Every structure is written in C-alpha cells, then in structure tokens.
Amino acid sequence: MIRIAMVEDEAAVREQLMGYVQRYTRQYGTEFSVTEFADGMDILENYRPVYDIVFLDVEMKHLDGMETARRVRELDKDVIIVFITNMAQYAIG
C-alpha cells in the first residue's frame, strides 16, 4: 500500500485529486492510503515519516508549499514531494 499525504487548501481541488487516485486504483489495482491536510501547518503539526508521497500545493494561506516542503524535508529525507499548482510560473513546460 502506498501512503499519500495530500496537502491542499481548496476542498474542491482535494476532491479532484482524490478522484485521480481512485481512478488509478481502478485501472491498475494499486492500493493507496490517503491522508488529507488543508494547510502546511496541519501536516507539520504532528508530522511523522510514514508517507511515501506528499502532494503539496505551492500556494496556501498560512504556510506556503515551498516552506512546508523545506520543513518536511528536515523531518523526512526519503519522502517523495510532488508540487501541485495552478500557477503558471511554477509549471514545467
């Protein structure tokens, strides 16, 4: 089972991402355990290195994704961090 932390401040986007994960599960049979966080502070509050992947929004109200990633990396050198954003300047073309 792959353990995912999903850090996204917009509930509609979290729901959309969950849909992608569920569709992947249906297509490929891979099982996921997803824990949702609405803010960078939420995941950092009691962070333990139990996740395989962290999906992390770049722009959030209380603590942005870049700073959250820096702090997560201090606590967990092995977790895969995937940034998610709708901001064109951060997109890879």
List the predicted regions and their residue ranges.
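Non-catalytic signal-transmission and effector/linker regions of two-component phosphorelay proteins
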Residues: 1-3
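Conserved SAM-binding loop
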Residues: 6, 36, 83-84
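Short amphipathic alpha-helical segments
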Residues: 18-19, 48, 67-68
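Acidic, metal-coordinating helix/loop segments flanking the phosphotransfer/catalytic sites
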Residues: 33-53
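CheY-like receiver
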Residues: 51-93
